[in-house]
């Protein structure tokens, strides 16, 4: 993404990040350990991700209700305590300028800023910054101190405030304590108790950048330029001090966090209105990160041997920059300094590339963090100059120079978005400071009518089953609507009926022509029903789509000899196209959906691995994934109505035939010569063709763990259990976005 650097210089420092990180050549080598199955057979599906964060690792217990505990919290008292903390400087880590505001802004930013829109992973929603690898990323150096400074507050309020809420709330309080009016704040994040296994990049060294190919093309879904960074290298790409090339990196990485140019410029300029970076001396004097630090340091890392190691001697990034003359006050001084001087390339005391006002201009106008009688020259990062040199950023920031009120408004909105981007719809937010829903929160209208009851539900099911739509059509449409959900950032799902809107209605996986016919039929049923009702009772299309799926499952179960009722709770509403950001929703389009036997053409990753990824996004366990595959194959719900994996002679009957026939030793499988990613099953004795399948189907007979699950549902006495488990898993998926039911 960047051009070659036009500036010649001596070399690159290893100490680089968007804000701060020490020089660490590579992660600590692993100690000898027994080999795992994953080591021996790395290509097997990684099912452990479906069982992470179990109740066994949670000390709060299965019945802990964070919402109920939070309701007991005095949020105003909490806010006062956090703000008081800002100016309570501790000798073991003294506050720059007597105020921890800059440190806490950085902590909150880096907690939330790992979010990436491509797969919804990262973000501050679970307090993951407390654990490896994030707690030891080079870019998060010294944030261990920020979390320790917060401990007395956490200790005081206990289970009424989660770490994940507190880590991001502290930054909000920091801004307000320095005179900034924030846009709002929502609590409601719940803690995890073990590290998440997330693909952060292919590198095995800190600050490695093997993630690029071609003309600096960043591999998806990654959102940072180097391993261990949140966004970009503040010295420039790979330490090359080129502001224009750095702008390209900035635009790419912030865009992958769902920020546009205005939001990006606002966050950088707003965040750098406060505090400083730290590079008082040689970065090689900084000790190991928290996960590699000696046990006696009790989880604190990056202990420095330079001088006192703290305060005026602190080293974090190797950069030594104070951006403004008022680093503990909100004003427009960052932009005034940025545009008020011409800049020349210099080096910090640690040898990192940074910029200083030319010809000694402004000398003494910038305060020293610990000596009020001393003054400094204005300094900036390479990435700061990007806001002035890149034409698009320059147009935005130069306007703000003359219109500071616009800058303040844009920073407030961008900061709010940064802290909350991974939390899903506003209905999940808690507390008194939640503003109205924003477009990026995928809003849906409030229910403004009486909901359907049992009698209306029964009548609508009858209309649906008499409409001429097949079980396959009913089930496929309901699944397509609900299975857009991502548990990583709580986006997607059936609420809103966005399957009828752009972009979802046009996705290949949804078979647009077929989908249109189904939706037209359901919309007619909806209109006829709503026009015939009195007393304000109505049904939304979102509810009707899910109800239609339930009716289809019930009919299929009846076809197999089972009389069941699929749970259904009305209350969904229909979003409008104006409430739907097409570009933002585009990232939800599945590259694969093994539940419908869909694989995007040209996809390089194994289909079975993508199935596990889809199951993870749907918060499914391995048994739930297994029973859903078997049931959806029996219901003939494949993309394009292919017969792959439909191992039954009675499709649209909810039977366990998929498992019975998959495990039948009378079938021999081989790769199909006529189609990629397709297998053909033939009779072991006669050689007659029997079935076709994909890797998603066959993995349930090939993988030992999945085969064990398949065997449970293939036994002679498993039919009832299969139906019950399928209905339970189906209902779970249909309600993944029903946060109003929690």
From Swiss-Prot:
<keyword id="KW-0408">Iron</keyword>
<keyword id="KW-0349">Heme</keyword>
<dbReference type="GO" id="GO:0046872">
    <property type="term" value="F:metal ion binding"/>
</dbReference>
<dbReference type="InterPro" id="IPR000763">
    <property type="entry name" value="Catalase_peroxidase"/>
</dbReference>
<dbReference type="GO" id="GO:0004096">
    <property type="term" value="F:catalase activity"/>
</dbReference>
<feature type="site" description="Transition state stabilizer">
    <location>
        <position position="106"/>
    </location>
</feature>
<feature type="active site" description="Proton acceptor">
    <location>
        <position position="110"/>
    </location>
</feature>
<dbReference type="GO" id="GO:0070301">
    <property type="term" value="P:cellular response to hydrogen peroxide"/>
</dbReference>
<feature type="region of interest" description="Disordered">
    <location>
        <begin position="1"/>
        <end position="42"/>
    </location>
</feature>
<dbReference type="Pfam" id="PF00141">
    <property type="entry name" value="peroxidase"/>
</dbReference>
<protein>
    <recommendedName>
        <fullName>Catalase-peroxidase</fullName>
        <ecNumber>1.11.1.21</ecNumber>
    </recommendedName>
</protein>
<dbReference type="GO" id="GO:0020037">
    <property type="term" value="F:heme binding"/>
</dbReference>
<comment type="similarity">
    <text>Belongs to the peroxidase family. Peroxidase/catalase subfamily.</text>
</comment>
<feature type="cross-link" description="Tryptophyl-tyrosyl-methioninium (Trp-Tyr) (with M-257)">
    <location>
        <begin position="109"/>
        <end position="231"/>
    </location>
</feature>
<keyword id="KW-0575">Peroxidase</keyword>
<keyword id="KW-0376">Hydrogen peroxide</keyword>
<comment type="subunit">
    <text>Homodimer or homotetramer.</text>
</comment>
<dbReference type="InterPro" id="IPR010255">
    <property type="entry name" value="Haem_peroxidase_sf"/>
</dbReference>
<dbReference type="InterPro" id="IPR002016">
    <property type="entry name" value="Haem_peroxidase"/>
</dbReference>
<feature type="cross-link" description="Tryptophyl-tyrosyl-methioninium (Tyr-Met) (with W-109)">
    <location>
        <begin position="231"/>
        <end position="257"/>
    </location>
</feature>
<dbReference type="InterPro" id="IPR019794">
    <property type="entry name" value="Peroxidases_AS"/>
</dbReference>
<dbReference type="GO" id="GO:0005829">
    <property type="term" value="C:cytosol"/>
</dbReference>
<dbReference type="GO" id="GO:0042744">
    <property type="term" value="P:hydrogen peroxide catabolic process"/>
</dbReference>
<dbReference type="InterPro" id="IPR019793">
    <property type="entry name" value="Peroxidases_heam-ligand_BS"/>
</dbReference>
<keyword id="KW-0479">Metal-binding</keyword>
<feature type="binding site" description="axial binding residue">
    <location>
        <position position="272"/>
    </location>
    <ligand>
        <name>heme b</name>
    </ligand>
</feature>
<comment type="function">
    <text>Bifunctional enzyme with both catalase and broad-spectrum peroxidase activity.</text>
</comment>
<keyword id="KW-0560">Oxidoreductase</keyword>
